[in-house]
Structures are given as C-alpha cells and as structure tokens.
A protein has these predicted regions:
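Conserved NTP-binding/hydrolysis module of P-loop NTPases
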Residues: 18-22, 89-105
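Conserved small helical "lid"/interfacial subdomain of P-loop NTPases
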Residues: 190-215
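Conserved AAA+ ATPase "SRH/arginine-finger" region at the nucleotide-binding site
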Residues: 80-84, 168-172, 176-183, 187-199
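Conserved P-loop NTPase "ATPase switch" module shared by AAA+ and STAND
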Residues: 118-139, 143, 147-150
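Walker A/P-loop nucleotide-binding motif
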Residues: 47-69, 83-84
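Sensor-1/coupling segment of RecA-like P-loop NTPase cores
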Residues: 54-59, 135, 147-178
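A short, basic N-terminal segment
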Residues: 1-50, 236-241
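A short helix-loop-helix "switch/interaction" segment in the helical subdomain of ASCE P-loop NTPases
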Residues: 215-229
Length: 241
C-alpha cells in the first residue's frame, strides 16, 4: 500500500485501513458532484410530484451515495438496494423493513396489501429501487403493481446501469410480458447520470483531507472516474502519509 500498489490490495485490507484511519461511514464527507446534484433533483421531483422515473448511470457514478443521503434527510423515502437472489417475497420483505413495518410475514398478496395500505396513509411517499437491473423479470413486474395501485400518490424511481434500458427496450421489442408497460410507465425516458469529472474527484479529495495536487492527479488517473475507487484511493493515500 505504501509503495502505491493499490490494485493488489484485497477488500478485507481496505476495510481494516478504513477503520484504522477513522473514515468509516459517516466520517466520509459527501460532495455535491454533478451526479449527486442530478440524482437528488430527480428524487425531489419524484417525491414532491408523485412521479415515476428511471435513472441510469455507470457503476460508481454516485447514484447510491446520493440516494442514501437523500433518504436520511427526507421523510417517507425508502431505499431498496436490490440483490440478484431476491425473489418476490424477498423484495416485499425488504420494502416492509425499510418502511419500518413490523409484520414482514404472510403471503405475497398479504405483503402487497399491507405495503399499499401503509403507503396510502403517508404524505408523498417515495420508493427508490436501486440496482433494479439485478431483479428478475417476475420481481421487476412489482413495479407495475405499485404504479397501478399508487399512481399520483407515491413516487417511484428505478436506478440502474444502462443495462436496464437495453433490457426494457429489448423486452418490449420482443413482446415479453410486462416490458411495454414498464417502458410506458417511466415515460419512455431514461435519465442519464452525468460523467464524473476530474473536478468532481478533486473536490472529493479535498473535502476528505487530500490537498496535495500530485496525489489528487494520481487518484484521478487510477480511479477510472469510479467514485467507489476514489474513496479507496483516498483511504490508501491517508494511510501512507
């Protein structure tokens, strides 16, 4: 790590370093990058106006960090970080947990009814389905269910890489069940996240204690403009200095 061979370091070591230099979780300074601002603007618009939107961007462009910060500061906003192994019940149980609902048991029908009933009581709720491209088709169909039941009351934002757009367009073209409806409900529009810039990375470095210009340039080059990578490289620099 001290010699700059950062690509060879395993995840476990990065976690140890993060703990050791006091930069876990809340100690990492969030910077309003171009991607952060766009993601936040979409979430605000969707929640205030009960809109349904789809946002796509490269991995590491800052979508999830902006979402996490938004949810911490806005009532009735729920962040689902999806996983490939989720089935229908896993999806619904995780949404129940994010909403603070105690009862996460019952049939799929029961869970849907409980969630809809709870959301109908809330003022301007927002469901954020992060990494939606990891969901199987049958789970992604829940998007249609919640849209139909909560239209004009609950905002829904699908977030993913560009693969989601390709998948939905291809699904509609091949007349696969549900994809035409999904495409229609997001307004046939996928909002693109802006590319991370060197200025974004420099601002992140400076906000987190790295102000040496050479170090910032090195981090920028090695990061491939992936903000998760930037965080790791900042940790490594602080450890070696």
């Amino acid at each position: 790590m001290i010699n700059g061979n950062w690509e060879l370091i395993k995840d476990e070591m990065w976690r140890t370093v993060s703990n050791g230099i006091g930069m876990q979780g809340g100690n990492w300074a969030t910077v309003a990058t171009g991607g952060y601002k766009r993601m936040t603007s979409v979430l605000e618009d969707a929640q205030e106006n009960s809109l349904v939107m789809a946002v796509i961007g490269d991995a590491g462009c800052g979508k999830t960090q902006a979402i996490e910060h938004y949810v911490k500061n806005h009532r009735n906003a729920y962040h689902l970080q999806c996983a490939e192994y989720w089935n229908k019940k896993n999806f619904l149980q995780n949404l129940c947990q994010q909403m603070g609902m105690r009862n996460t048991y019952g049939t799929v029908y029961d869970l849907i009814e409980d969630i809809v009933r709870e959301l109908e009581k809330e003022d301007s709720p927002l469901i954020i389905v992060d990494e939606a491209d990891k969901l199987s088709d049958v789970v992604l169909y829940f998007f249609i269910t919640f849209y139909n039941r909560l239209e004009d009351h609950c905002g829904i934002v699908l977030c993913a890489t560009g693969y989601l757009k390709k998948r939905i367009i291809a699904g509609e073209r091949n007349e696969r069940k549900g994809f035409a409806e999904i495409h229609s409900r997001v307004g046939r529009n996928f909002i693109g996240m802006p590319q991370t810039t060197s200025e974004d990375i420099a601002a992140i470095c400076e906000a987190n204690g790295v102000d040496d210009l050479n170090a910032i340039n090195t981090i920028c080059k090695k990061s491939d403009f992936d903000l998760r990578r930037v965080k790791r490289l900042v940790h490594a620099y602080k450890q070696s200095n």
